[in-house]
């Protein structure tokens, strides 16, 4: 059976050309310094490149320093989340790690025996604090989004009750936080030189736009990770898999349902964006309009970049993928 990710349609102006690649090596050296990666370990190097390279798709037009910050965010996501997802910690230890990470972000201090991900988190936090300057509201939004993501990991991993997959609405409600899109958006706000009024980010349309994009990113991630998760016996939390069981349909029909869902959220987002732009006060200078467009472009790039990155990453590509665009190599 051959499915195509190109069945998913986005507006043409959401397309992107990825940023340059040299930051990946820079962030890798940081990972070695902070104890996230083991020296001269090819598996670590491959994992790092696969995950951190996503930043060049999410932030295709930023300078090197900001691209590094995006890479650090991806490095933190991957190393902290995969540790909890791997099942190597019991519930008590997992909760302890979550609470420790919350303190790193909220208080800006490390525990006495810091882990590599905690060191990465503190470095990124301190960079954001310096870049924000007087923009305490921006900094607080970034910290809040990171804490919310950290706090979502354990609840999402517990969402299966009695071995049953959740309803798609419950799944989407939890996953839109757990996917990690919100910290990407608030980090993008940190990157601004900032000529915008802070009330913009409290607009309910803006918040709903973020939610719609997060759900689309989630669904794209579920599509591209389908084969890997099924092979790892983790398909119960993948809607492409559990739609087949819940609705008694085959893979092709399950994919059609996923595409229909994505189409709905993309269309709803476009309507919200149009309303959001109509409600904004008149721009005082061209920089304000540029910064609004910069934020909107980032939302667009989160989903188009996710799909583009997924078509080439060894993390998900495989000769036996159900998606023709992903029938390539896979990492060992």
From Swiss-Prot:
Which EC numbers characterise this protein's activity in its record? 4.2.3.160
Short sequence motif DDxx(x)D/E motif: positions: 81-86
What keywords is this UniProt entry annotated with? Answer: Lyase, Metal-binding
Q: Which reaction does it catalyse?
A: (2E,6E)-farnesyl diphosphate = (2S,3R,6S,9S)-(-)-protoillud-7-ene + diphosphate
User: What's an example of a GO molecular-function annotation for this chain?
Assistant: metal ion binding
Indicate the family of this protein: Belongs to the terpene synthase family.
Q: What does this protein do?
A: Terpene synthase that converts its substrate farnesyl diphosphate (FPP) into the sesquiterpene protoillud-7-ene.
Show the domain comment.
Contains several highly conserved motifs that are important for catalytic activity including the aspartate-rich 'DDxx(x)D/E' motif and the 'NDxxSxxxD/E' motif, both of which are involved in complexing metal ions to coordinate the binding of the isoprenyl diphosphate substrate in the active site.
Protein name, UniProt field: Terpene synthase 1
The encoding gene is TPS1
